Amino acid sequence: MRKAGELIAAYLREGKLAANRSEPIGTGGNAVVYASDVPGNVMKQLTYRDEGKFGLPGDDPKVIDEANLQAIAAEMGMAPRVAGVETFRGGIGNRIEMADVRDNFETHGNNYRGFPSGRDAVRVNQQLGQLALKGVRLEDRHNGNVLYNKATGRPMQLDFGIAGRVEGSEQVATLANATAEGFEAAGLGDVASIYRATVMDLLEGGDVADAMDVAKQGFSRLQKIK
């Protein structure tokens, strides 16, 4: 049984977090972001009942998978550091605590639901390709889910709610799509078309290893674009 002091501390903490949640930093269709009770951190709290990835008995809460994927990106310097995950009975109110990066990062673009373009899009797709090589597929990269370093323009990826692990042909396709979209953003549409078609032809023929070889060669070229 928890000691009375622990229960009181937990109650007071939830009261502070509830007050912070009433003044959110940002809201989306599936979550709300607000200041943590720990200075320098923020909370991302799901606004739906988290019944796991597939909603089956015994499924781990989806928030755990999301935090694990974000942690991979954070280790690569592409996402905020994950400080912790909290889950609650019935999957209601599950949340991720992470570093608040707003002091050094900013949004780009006039339309929150628009997508990165030009150099920003090249850099975002370079990161998506690096994540693909780590076996991570990250989607939903609209302007509200990407911040940029105020000094260097380096992207910082937010929101790993629409993401997953990939391997085999799916990993190749994920890498190829990120690379092709990066080429297109750099104004190399013809290169993107030929590259994508080549990789997909190999995949359709069952040549996964050769397709990955070509995908990596193209991505290496994308990485050289500044």
Question: Residue spans of the language-model regions?
Answer:
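ATP-binding glycine-rich phosphate-binding loop
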Residues: 4-38
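ATP-binding glycine-rich loop module of kinase domains
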Residues: 27-68
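Active-site beta-strand termini and strand-to-loop segments that position acidic
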Residues: 35-39, 100, 149
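Protein kinase-like catalytic core scaffold
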Residues: 41, 78, 96, 154-156
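Conserved structural core of kinase catalytic domains
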Residues: 71, 77-122
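Catalytic-loop of the protein kinase fold
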Residues: 133-143
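C-lobe/activation-segment region of protein kinase-like
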Residues: 136, 149-226
